[in-house]
């Protein structure tokens, strides 16, 4: 059993290394925000009476695909490096930061759906980040 546990940990570490390069603090932040967003989304759906398992499954699928997209961004950086184009993980970092901002926006929207007051300036910033500056 102990050997299986060690083997499983080694396989997981190799997979993470292949998919994301090294695990960075930005990935830890993204993972944390993904979990918080999913949790706040569940609570907001419960408060508004819109909770259902199909929507929850779609939410989990979307969260998984965030990490698929980040892995693809890392692979693009790796391919570019292999052909002599040094990106310094620019595509990977851009993807991670994009999804971090997206998760933050969603968390604040969930807070509003739960009835938690969201400061006007924060609402304006979210509108700008979403590309809807008219609000």
Curated annotation (Swiss-Prot):
Membrane topology note: Multi-pass membrane protein
Transmembrane segments: 7-25, 29-51, 64-85, 89-108
Family per similarity comment: Belongs to the bacteriophage holin family. Cp-1 holin subfamily.
Keyword hit for Cell membrane: yes
Protein name as it appears in the record: Uncharacterized protein BH0965
GO terms under cellular component: plasma membrane
Main location: membrane
Cellular localization per UniProt: Cell membrane
Keyword hit for Transmembrane: yes
Taxonomy, superkingdom: Bacteria
Keyword line: Cell membrane, Membrane, Transmembrane, Transmembrane helix
InterPro entries according to UniProt: Phage_holin_4_1
């Amino acid at each position: 059993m102990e050997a299986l546990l060690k083997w499983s940990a080694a396989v997981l570490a190799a997979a993470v290394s292949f998919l994301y390069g090294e695990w960075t603090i930005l990935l830890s932040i993204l993972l944390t925000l993904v979990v918080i967003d999913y949790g706040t989304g569940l609570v907001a759906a419960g408060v508004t009476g819109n909770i259902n398992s199909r929507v929850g499954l779609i939410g989990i699928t979307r969260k998984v695909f965030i990490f698929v997209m980040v892995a693809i961004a890392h692979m693009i950086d790796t391919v570019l490096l292999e052909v002599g184009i040094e990106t310094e993980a620019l595509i990977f970092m851009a993807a991670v930061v994009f999804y971090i901002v997206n998760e933050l926006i969603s968390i604040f929207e969930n807070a509003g759906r739960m009835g938690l007051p969201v400061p006007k300036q924060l609402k304006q910033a979210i509108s700008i980040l979403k590309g809807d500056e008219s609000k």
